[in-house]
UniProtKB/Swiss-Prot annotation:
Family annotation (HAMAP family): Rhamnulokinase
UniProt GO BP: glycerol metabolic process; rhamnose catabolic process
Cofactor dependence: Mg(2+)
EC number in record: 2.7.1.5
Pathway linked to the protein: Carbohydrate degradation; L-rhamnose degradation; glycerone phosphate from L-rhamnose: step 2/3
InterPro entries, alphabetized: ATPase_NBD (IPR043129), FGGY_C (IPR018485), FGGY_N (IPR018484), Rhamnulokinase (IPR013449)
Catalytic residues, chain numbering: D237
Protein known as: Rhamnulokinase
Organism: Salmonella paratyphi B (strain ATCC BAA-1250 / SPB7)
Superkingdom: Bacteria
Function recorded in the entry: Involved in the catabolism of L-rhamnose (6-deoxy-L-mannose). Catalyzes the transfer of the gamma-phosphate group from ATP to the 1-hydroxyl group of L-rhamnulose to yield L-rhamnulose 1-phosphate.
Binding site residues for substrate: G83, H236, D237, T238, N296
Cystine connections: C68-C222, C353-C370, C413-C417
């Protein structure tokens, strides 16, 4: 067969999309077409920040039906989403309550309990995962302690992409790359860790053994009656994005830029040393047994909140105004946990500047400048941490995802990090999702083979660092500004 048609369902914390890929195996060309795009946002339910899971499922099914109604024979479907959040099911496989978002404050104070009762080094030795207050381990502890009546009804817990696959196929699956984000998977066995799971109060019977990407979960029956395989892709969206990152060699780092920024490198081994623990480095699962050694950065969430609060719709115009402003007048630590979900992001940024005796950004452009400069300097700081961890410098940084369209931030990143930046592809998570499907269909050999396809089909933009830029002169001064309460213990 010359042509393959695969559908990627890619859900982010702010939007979702159903994308159709067409792969020509003879010429190794790959094209994407957006079929359906929809909004994903938090809602308040009984005092909790929850996801409208039924609306998301409705939009997923609508997108799939649109493809089928075009008369296209779909070869496979794959679903990726953000990590850590989950859906609870009862014995009949029916949903129990609504899934609570990782941004909800129910986990406040939970992580410190684990550090005392289990021990920080012991948790890290077992999981190899960074300490974030909203990791699934702490969410489950909050659930079992705060909602025992709800907990009593639970028979299964599925992570978000596995839930949607279950709704399409009727088959339950626990995909490995996303499972590792829970901080509950043992890094040595690739299975759920009994000690960590027991601490949460959740039952091990709620979970099946994690499966690696590339297996067929089951079939979705389309309106025309065709049975279409649903593939377990690398269902954590960052894992999919990394698969589509055209990393040139071992000296290349990646930055998946969106609501969150995930900066790291690929490795055949995990890093769980005391140095890695001190830097709060995570070792999330990847495809083909690789590890995604990385750090979470708050990312463009800060900007997204400012845009929403200020009702700004013309982002290019705002960026143009921002670029005209002097650099580094206002600097914050984007990873300060005060920015996780404040009532007023603009006011929170202003307060952070005021508390550190800096000028206070007032205009929208000044707020954006503060965010961009601070992110670029944090990227440089974390890239330095990662290089020290592996004992080797990086020569190139690949920025993928929606954030790679921000040319100003890309250049600031190159200047601050002092290395060449390659930006693209934009739809990295979708492409990585498609890549695993094509491998499962025996159209591609492995991840490296797929990256050659990506490089041949998608243009990348190069940014050369300017060592004389204003931001480059602030790199050494930024470290003290990070001495705030970050997203870690």
């Amino acid at each position: 067969m010359t042509f393959r048609h695969c559908v990627a369902v890619d859900l982010g914390a702010s939007s979702g999309r159903v994308m159709l890929a067409r792969y020509d195996s003879k010429h190794r060309t790959l094209t994407l077409r957006e079929i359906h795009r929809f909004v994903n946002c938090l809602q308040k339910t009984d005092g909790f920040d929850t996801w409208d899971i039924d609306s998301l499922e409705k939009d997923i099914r609508l997108g799939l039906k649109k493809v089928c109604n075009e008369g296209i024979l779909i070869d496979s479907i794959g679903i990726d989403t953000w990590g850590v959040d989950y859906v609870l099911l009862d014995k009949q496989g029916q949903r129990v309550g609504l899934p609570v978002s990782y941004r909800d404050n129910r986990t406040t104070g939970i992580m410190p309990q684990a550090l005392v009762q289990i021990g920080k080094s012991e948790i890290y030795r077992r999981s190899g995962i960074q300490f974030l207050p909203f990791n699934t381990i702490y969410q489950l502890r909050a659930l079992t302690k705060q909602q025992p009546e709800l907990t009593a009804q639970v028979a299964h817990a599925l992570l978000m992409p596995d839930y949607f696959s279950y709704r399409l196929t009727g088959e339950m699956n626990w995909e490995y790359t996303n499972a590792t984000t829970t901080q509950l998977v043992n890094i040595n066995t690739d299975d759920w860790d009994d000690t960590l799971l027991a601490w949460t109060g959740a039952k091990k019977s709620w979970f099946g053994r994690p499966s690696h990407p590339g297996n067929v979960i089951g079939d979705w029956i389309c309106p025309q009656g065709n049975r279409i395989p649903v593939v377990a892709v690398a269902s954590h969206d960052t894992a999919s994005a990394v698969i589509a990152s055209p990393l040139a060699n071992k000296h290349s780092a990646y930055l998946s830029s969106g609501t969150w920024s995930l900066m790291g490198f690929e490795s055949k081994k995990p890093y769980t040393t005391d140095e890695a623990l001190a830097a709060n480095i995570t070792n999330e699962g990847g495809a083909e047994g690789r590890y995604r050694v990385l750090k979470n950065i708050m990312g463009l969430w800060l900007l997204q909140r400012v845009l929403k609060e200020r009702r700004i719709t013309d982002l290019p115009a705002l960026i143009a105004q921002t670029e005209a402003l002097p650099a580094c007048r206002f600097l914050i630590n984007p990873n300060d946990d005060r920015f996780i979900n404040p009532d007023d992001m603009r006011a929170e940024i202003q307060a952070a500047c005021r508390e550190t005796d800096q000028p206070v950004p007032v205009s929208d452009a000044e707020l954006a400048r503060c965010i961009f400069d601070s992110l670029a300097l944090l990227y440089a700081d974390i890239l330095h941490e990662l290089a020290n961890l592996r004992g080797e410098k990086f020569t190139q940084l690949h920025i993928v995802g929606g954030g790679c369209q921000n040319a100003l931030l890309n250049q600031l990143c190159a200047d601050a990090c002092g290395i060449r930046v390659m930006a693209g592809p934009v739809e990295a998570s979708t492409l990585g999702n498609i890549g695993i499907q094509l491998m499962t269909l025996d159209e591609l050999n492995n991840v490296d083979d797929f990256r050659q396809v990506v490089s041949a089909n998608y243009d990348l933009t190069t940014y050369i660092p300017n060592p004389d830029s204003e931001i480059a002169r602030h790199v050494a001064q930024f470290q003290p500004k990070r001495q705030t309460k970050e997203l870690c213990a």
